[in-house]
């Protein structure tokens, strides 16, 4: 998978800034296959792992009927895979009984101006905010409060996906020792990577002012993180 890698001084070298921007890209579905994939026209704005939504027009209005993620790019075209749109998975909102079809509009890089932020300490948190002034970062206390309520001091992909859905965020930013990444919050594909410096100290499970993120005996998958970097690196493993 193609990634954008930037080498930065200090931890992030934010004195000269760190640019990251993937503009929203709209294009119609050209063809839809029986295996749950479809073809669209490619664009430099989209990367493998970029996600978005499918819009279907009902008379004068349009509605989201599915999620999509980019799975391949070749010869001026890109293949996308359909998924259930998370925000529609509510018992009071029936799922639309409409399958994506040719002519429906795909909106990729959806909500890519909003991101969760996972960093090991307050100083790095403040650096990141200063480096990406055009990114709307969801305050880590919101994620911390969710994990505290769920007794999950070891957040998983699904935990972050839920928080992205609840916060209307399309990205997750994670700072680790030696590298930091922006990734799609649903596919967890790394979209941009920064080579960074050494982390001097860690707050677990990440920097937040919520202090009571603890375990509970009846949750077998709940345990404290011993190694911050190993835990978050695992989230981005291809087979995870």
Role assignments for model-derived ranges:
Residues 4-14:
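Sec-dependent N-terminal signal peptides
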Residues 17-240:
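Surface-exposed, polar/charged interaction patches used for macromolecular assembly or partner binding
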